[in-house]
């Protein structure tokens, strides 16, 4: 069923494909245009450089009049990211405008990585390290970057484990005695 929100999301997707912003990518899930997977590459010359951070964007039928929920799936150590992965970003709350699209949301999140708002932290520990012990903050961020490279490996291992479990189940079926 085509709704204004779904039509707008398809326009956003088309724009992402025709004019992809640097360092970000996103696409709707194959079976649900209201949920998108996204990846942000950590900006050059920042502690986040070369990180590959996965996010999930969840839209409802109020989009673009209401912002999506944006959540890091990858581990993220940042003053404006809650432990749950949820973001504290003004354009996703009180400064939302229907003129924002998926591309502008992701580029805003990308720029937030190196320019946190420490006056309103979601992660107090990260904010305090950023303010008072920058070298420790950078060290923790670099660990997060390294972990982001393993996210894909973890997913592949989980898929392999699931495949092996299915194969074992198939073997068990072969051993059933029929009377």
From Swiss-Prot:
UniProt keywords, alphabetically: ATP-binding, Chromatin regulator, Cytoplasm, DNA damage, DNA repair, Nucleotide-binding, Nucleus, Sporulation, Transcription, Transcription regulation, Transferase, Ubl conjugation pathway
Function, as annotated: Catalyzes the covalent attachment of ubiquitin to other proteins. Plays a role in transcription regulation by catalyzing the monoubiquitination of histone H2B to form H2BK123ub1. H2BK123ub1 gives a specific tag for epigenetic transcriptional activation and is also a prerequisite for H3K4me and H3K79me formation. Also involved in postreplication repair of UV-damaged DNA, in N-end rule-dependent protein degradation and in sporulation.
Catalytic activity of the protein: S-ubiquitinyl-[E1 ubiquitin-activating enzyme]-L-cysteine + [E2 ubiquitin-conjugating enzyme]-L-cysteine = [E1 ubiquitin-activating enzyme]-L-cysteine + S-ubiquitinyl-[E2 ubiquitin-conjugating enzyme]-L-cysteine
Enzyme class of the recorded protein, top EC level: transferase
Pathway the protein takes part in: Protein modification; protein ubiquitination
Region (Acidic tail): 151-179
Gene name linked to the record: UBC2
Disordered, as annotated region: 1-28, 145-179
Record protein name field: Ubiquitin-conjugating enzyme E2 2
InterPro entries per UniProt: Ub_conjugating_enzyme, UBQ-conjugat_E2_core, UBQ-conjugating_AS, UBQ-conjugating_enzyme/RWD
Sequence ranges of Acidic residues compositional bias: 149-179
Family membership: Belongs to the ubiquitin-conjugating enzyme family.
GO biological process, one term: telomere maintenance via recombination
Active site, UniProt feature: 88 (glycyl thioester intermediate)
Induction text: Up-regulated by UV radiation, heat shock, osmotic stress and nitrogen starvation.
GO CC aspect terms: chromosome, telomeric region; cytoplasm; fungal biofilm matrix; HULC complex; MUB1-RAD6-UBR2 ubiquitin ligase complex; nucleus; Rad6-Rad18 complex; RAD6-UBR2 ubiquitin ligase complex
Start and end residues of each UBC core domain: 4-150
Localization of this protein: Cytoplasm; Nucleus
The enzyme's E.C. designation: 2.3.2.23
